[in-house]
């Protein structure tokens, strides 16, 4: 892997893409230290360490720790993710949008523009909601001296957060276009990873004071390493469906006759279902948690808190659900069967046409079942281990680990494809799932 990474840096274009990505991510981290005007950061951080403030943990995680600093990126990029989920649902139920989605590159460009506008509008609503229901509550308990809750303060918060979201979207698009990997995923990835070191140092401090057992900490680290290895193996695992192309003789030339395969991954949906699950889970927490004096709304926020059994159960269900939904969107057996028949290909032992469609659907449904169950298990296990060891860290939650591994592998896969085009050895070894054709 080190050899492959060194090879990547030897290619000027690839080196420029990697450096550009790192520079944009560094700029994103610098934004974490630009606070929203008028907000008392010390009081917010003190509140988030309490039991009541702990419910904001998942929001703080996906903002990369920006929520506890209430920087210009306090909302992170999750408003855009939520808007993307809403837009995908609308595309399936609104005929005009469905038609637009089938109009090629131009249609997708327009839908992406709608999603950006929706993300910024949602960010404006969330900024106003936080300014009025959270920051300005109880006479402005989280405001600096000289500031008071009112229209001017609300305006400042909304403008600051909208500018932050717009800047994050611009950064994400620049990474996707000129860098390596998916910009949106990498921003979430960077936000989670930078929280690891403070969490580890905090845990070491607890070990020194005797609040955390050293053996429990080592057991926790061993589990994290094993979880990484298991997730990487599953993300790479694939089932290869053999494909044979019929031979055609045209004059003195023979065309076709090659044997190849269709790779179907155990987790074909990648990291998107996990990010979508986190975005959906944040909505009720975000809407209910700011109302500290309302026991009903606090009960709702605690119910969806992923550190609680109820919230963890919902999180697992959402991961499994979105894995099925997104796999269905990504993998179309009918389109693949039509493509095979058009080019004279067939799966040995399976007739072309409808039998091929049903065969591929059967294979995908089985792989998706095991892949979804694995993702659900990995979402669940870290929380159980944290409860057993007494080491509680939202940064090392199952959903956080899944996103880190998924985004890292997707990015390495893009780098590898660039290396393979230039006849270099890649990063990743291929996993294989052996099975019968039926």
Swiss-Prot record:
Residues 1-18, 88-114, 176-182, 232-271, 324-372, 409-438 are cytoplasmic. Its main location: membrane. The keyword Cell inner membrane applies. One of its GO terms (cellular component) is plasma membrane. It holds the Pfam family SecY. The chain crosses the membrane at residues 19-34, 57-87, 115-130, 158-175, 183-201, 215-231, 272-288, 304-323, 373-389, 393-408. It comes from the Bacteria. Disulfide bonds: none annotated. Residues 35-56, 131-157, 202-214, 289-303, 390-392 are periplasmic. It is found in: Cell inner membrane. One of its GO terms (biological process) is intracellular protein transmembrane transport. It is a multi-pass membrane protein. Belongs to the SecY/SEC61-alpha family. PANTHER family: SECY/SEC61-ALPHA FAMILY MEMBER (PTHR10906). Component of the Sec protein translocase complex. Heterotrimer consisting of SecY, SecE and SecG subunits. The heterotrimers can form oligomers, although 1 heterotrimer is thought to be able to translocate proteins. Interacts with the ribosome. Interacts with SecDF, and other proteins may be involved. Interacts with SecA. NCBIfam families: 3a0501s007. The central subunit of the protein translocation channel SecYEG. Consists of two halves formed by TMs 1-5 and 6-10. These two domains form a lateral gate at the front which open onto the bilayer between TMs 2 and 7, and are clamped together by SecE at the back. The channel is closed by both a pore ring composed of hydrophobic SecY resides and a short helix (helix 2A) on the extracellular side of the membrane which forms a plug. The plug probably moves laterally to allow the channel to open. The ring and the pore may move independently. This is Protein translocase subunit SecY. It comes from Thermus thermophilus (strain ATCC 27634 / DSM 579 / HB8). The gene is secY.
